[in-house]
Amino acid sequence: MLGGQSGAGKTTIHRIKQKEFQGNIVIIDGDSFRSQHPRYLELQQEYGKDSVEYTKDFAGKMVESLVTELSHLGYNLLIEGTLRTIDVPKKTAQLLKSKGYEVQLALIATKPELSYLSTLIRYEELYSINPNQARATSKEHHDFIVNHLVDNTRQLEELAIFERIQIYQRDRSCVYDSKENTTSAATVLHDLLFGEWNQVEKEMLKSGEERLKDLTNRNGL
């Protein structure tokens, strides 16, 4: 199971785990199901970038159904989430464990300024292809996840429902592994999210800001 705020770069972990499982893993990402909502285009036209609010329940039900069906068949699963609350990951982990699965949690630790910048860049990129399909992430939604990520990780650690917790960064490096580290994952995550900026992060911010400026000018927004 994956966790991290919008724009943090969870796709990075997709690639790492696909390689680890030699491609033998099914990726379940709720966002990818939004466009399959029966009234998707209608909702896009009516609500524009706010349509995410109207497709989230559908996407959630799709994820739930797939997890139930595919776990029954015994597939390796990579389930993407934000860790906005602990309810869904806790319930999912318990369901999978009851079916004999080993359940691990992989988090991506990205500075909030960088992840929010990524959501803005992603919106502009999609807008330049098709303004009707562009999906925005509200700052409130993004920050809510960030502000609860550490505490939710701590609660999940205390529940001890994951056999392993790993923390990755955008450069694909694994900076924490509960099988090797005795420190709390939540403590490490807090330092990575809100601590000192390293040189790579500073450069990512600079190039991201330039990219956003270029896209905004091109889109005339």
Label for each model-derived stretch:
Residues 77-82, 104-106, 139-140:
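Short catalytic-loop micro-motif centered on adjacent basic/acidic residues
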Residues 25-99:
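Conserved nucleotide-sensing/catalytic segment adjacent to the nucleotide-binding pocket
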Residues 13:
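Hydrophobic positions on the alpha1 helix immediately C-terminal to the Walker A/P-loop
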